[in-house]
């Protein structure tokens, strides 16, 4: 099942590391398996991964599933290597993943303050332009890293033609950016 406890997360991450993984995207959970924003849980997972998976890139989730906006960036002071940053809102099947502009600006500022590389999550084309605007305003550093999130219900379908278009637009607005999908 889903690794829930700190020790389970560290153990499963170590297995992935041994198999060749170089990056761990971390969501922490409460004992009842609901999403958590508890900075101490993030710190414990981070410490365990650093100890057992030397050199692995640690990326914290700032995602909003069931988490209060005020708490979503509350763990960034632990200075992970990377953290997710959705640059706009999207309709998920079970609700709205809310990322209003002032909230995105605040998370971006915190990542800049702690020298955290954002993984810019792009669920639609507007979010790509929002990310470019964050760089123009000095809230993100170039070169950016973009994650095109595709194949999720109510977001972009996972189609080659769409990805090729997104890459073309990325090169136009952030020519030095790296990307994954």
Positions of the model-derived regions?
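Active-site beta->alpha loop and helix N-cap motifs at the rims of alpha/beta catalytic domains
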Residues: 6, 36-99
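Alpha-helix-loop-beta-strand connector modules within alpha/beta enzyme cores
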Residues: 34-60, 106-113, 164-176
